[in-house]
């Protein structure tokens, strides 16, 4: 039994502070990204503003989580902060998959429109994310071990796996198109730079999915109860690294590979459109 007015278990008593620190880290990342947007007005795409919005949702989510756990720890109930936390968890979770999908599809970076198959993926991911967040809320508010809890846990796991798989398809298609374009036209060096960039981003996405869905689960299932915070910490570190790495790859600077190719392609827009099969 914990000494003093601490209603959290021993392994979770440090979580309020940890999430507050995580919120500060994401606040710093948001400040840096905002500065980049201000200083690089001539190199901006719409996706950069969506990435900014994603960072904002993530930052607010971290602070709401910290406040929720703080009040649970000191008063035994979240004083309504859990509702705000669930709202921004939904916004952040849904927006993260949408942004990954749009970056992977090359939307606003390679082309101004989504292809029909990419639109279909998007219409699948959004409802799945709504279902995933409903399951997450139920799991957070109900007693573990009941039949209903186990059912919603299985639904959450299945839906999460489907979303993770779905967002990879547009990225794979973009890599395939870039590879074919690099082999067929005379702009090999330009397209190879962009191809390598998307290949690296694919590796980062796969590594993040593997770590956050498998390694974190193994931590949670194997560490002693006094170290329950380790899985939460590893999840936050992985997410922070993923956000920072993604921002670095697609930052709005003149020497970024996708921007260099975009400027080059303005002289032959019709050829580029045919190469990528853009549909309105």
Per-region residue spans from a language model:
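Hydrophobic alpha-helical transmembrane segments corresponding to the first two to three helices
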Residues: 1-131
